[in-house]
Amino acid sequence: MKLLLDTHILLRAAAGTLARDAEKMVIDDKNTLYFSPVSIWEIGIKQSLGRSDFMVDPAILRRGLLDNHYQELPITSAHALAVNDLPRLHKDPFDRMLLAQAKAEGLSLLTADNILHQYPGPVLFVPAG
């Protein structure tokens, strides 16, 4: 399965605090794991705002993801346009872009976000941990 990990799941994976269901998916060699520059951007913004739950260095996280064979999914204008096709269930622009990317690329979005879980389509919900 091709999985795009949302920002929260990426942070938990990096910290080694994933819930068991999410951890099984992440360590399964049959799955291809993707991350988006959207998550790196979100972490950088929220870190600069002093959010204590985003205190990882985004450059170090990115390097660690690449070193652990995660695939970086570039953002395209097609992804930006796909955001407009999403129902207005969620106001978070980072999460909306992640979902648009997953839909456009045929990936499943792995998330612990209860609002993202309400969207139809390729969303896999796992408990936060």
Question: Where on the chain are the PLM-derived regions?
Answer:
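Alpha-helix capping/helix-boundary segments
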Residues: 9-10, 39, 79, 98, ...
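Acidic catalytic patch
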Residues: 61-88
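Acidic, PIN/NYN-like endoribonuclease modules and their adjacent C-terminal/linker elements
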Residues: 97-129
